[in-house]
Amino acid sequence: WENSRFAECPSFMKSGDKHLLTASVCKADSHRFSVMYGTFDGSKFTPEYTGEVDKGPDQYAGQVFLDIKGRTILISWIPGWNYAGYRKKDIGCMSVPREIKLTDGKITGYPVEEVRHLMKEDDPALIRTANGFSIKRDGRKSVVYKGKINDLKIIRDGYILEVFVNGGEEIYSVLL
């Protein structure tokens, strides 16, 4: 969170045997939702992991909570603020609820079981390549993923594409 102008929508809670600190971090050139897992001794939080749940360009203002099943759930705004003049009828929506976990020292996120029936394996906006994929967006820079893909799931809702790579190891939320 270094070199940030400010942080919005902070959340701090116990998640499993760790504590979770989240915030939307605003830097000069980006707005990202960031996560820290670590320990809390009652007065000091010591982060053990820092990262982002979603690598896409359009995820912000995440809200994290524990549900009645004990899952750590994240719902974020997919804002589209850069496109307000481009598509005036909307400037985003909320993401699907995702269960987030710290697994093998890495943050993962995957749609909660209640919405998994919406998942598909392909979408016209997603172009598979030999070593990843790209997501075409109307007149704007494409989103590109390079890496091994063992599993790829997609949820599309209108102009929103949420892509889950390798069981949620990488996530891309994109306003098309």
Give a label for each model feature.
Residues 1-2, 9-13, 17-27, 71-83:
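Hydrophobic core segments of beta-strands in well-ordered, beta-rich domains
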Residues 2-7, 55-58:
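Short glycine-/Asp-/Thr-/Trp-enriched loop segments that recur within the blades
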Residues 15, 25-42, 56-59:
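Acidic, glycine-rich loop-and-beta core segments that form the ion-binding/anion-interacting portion
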